[in-house]
Each structure stands twice: as C-alpha cells, then as structure tokens.
Amino acid sequence: MSNMNWHIKGLLFENCSCQLICPAHISFKNVCNHDRCRGHWAFHIDEGCVADVILDSLNIVVVFDSPVQMHSGNWTQVFFIDERATEPQRDALEMIFSGKAGGPWEILAKFVSNQLTTRVVPMQFEDTGKTKRLLIPDMFETTVSAIRGSDGDKHAVLSNLHNVIHGPEHVLAHGKTRCTDSDFNFVLQKTHGLYSNFSWTG
C-alpha cells in the first residue's frame, strides 16, 4: 500500500498542555511551557482515499507525549481510530499517520520512538462552526472553541507559518481535553488550541 497514490482532506483540531500559543507550533526547536508536552491532533476526514480504499467521514485522533523540546524526539504516540472503519480503512489510516505512505507524517514519524497499539473505538464528532468536539465514551473527550478577533466578528488566526500538517490558515482556540486511556491520563483546561482545514497527498 505504501507505493499507492493517496489523498486526504478535512478538519484538523488540536489541544495540548501549553498555554496559547504552543511554542512548538512555531518551531519544534522551541521549548514548551511545561516539562512535557501532552496533547492530541484530532481529524475528521471529509474526503480521502488510498488507492480504492475510501476514507470519507472517518475520524482519527493522534495522542502524544513529548519531551519539553519536541525536536529532541522520543515521543510516545497512539492512534484512536473510528470503529466504523473497516479493516482495509484502518490499515490505510495507519499507513498514512505512521508516515509509511509518505506525505507530512513521514516527517513527524521521525520524532516518535514509542508507537503504542492502535485503539479502535466508537467516536462522536461535532462541528458547530466555532466549536469542534470529539468524544470517545469513557476514554477521551476534547473541545476546541475559536477565539474571537479584534473586529468582534471573525476568528483570530495565524497564517504564513511553516507547518507540515495544518492548512494555510490556523484558527486560534482555547481547548479542553480529558484523556483516561491506560497509557495516557491527563486533563487540559483552557490551554492551547487550533483548528484548520488540511489537505495532504502522497
């Protein structure tokens, strides 16, 4: 599958333990706010495929724990994959997000030293415009809510940053997350959050 063409696009939203804005979002060489950076990237796929395997409407969450300087590597990471995904769809998602299919995750995979066994779980995804939410019952819940800009109408945004997974415009947000997975147990409240529309190919 790694030699097959693929594309994927949709919504990406994140929350981590840093205060807004996470220093590592500007550069992995920056030092994060605490002794470790813990958080997630959550994805709702609008459209995507790996060869003839369609990925439309599926969700995946990447939960991570990294040292204070993310560029130093030694991340621990796990995938939560939507239980609606068939086995070929799960294989395709793992291929993309592990970096084995090329694309942006091939870069991020170099920082991961401990990839844990994927969890296949029920997911509930909600998008109400300025607020994005994903729930895995009894295990994981995250919400990010956009920060209003100075004009009182549009959201505050970041743009023209070098970032391999986000789209060109990142909406600033406050996030909250509760994770009670057996290997990740943390609670975040009003910390760094972002969301954007992503598009990748490989």
For the regions a language model picked out, list residue spans one by one:
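Internal, well-folded beta-alpha domain core
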Residues: 57-202
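Short, solvent-exposed secondary-structure capping/transition elements
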Residues: 26-31, 52-55, 90
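N-terminal start-of-chain detector that recognizes signal peptides
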Residues: 12-17, 32-33, 49-54, 105-107, ...
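Short, positively charged
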Residues: 37-61, 175-177
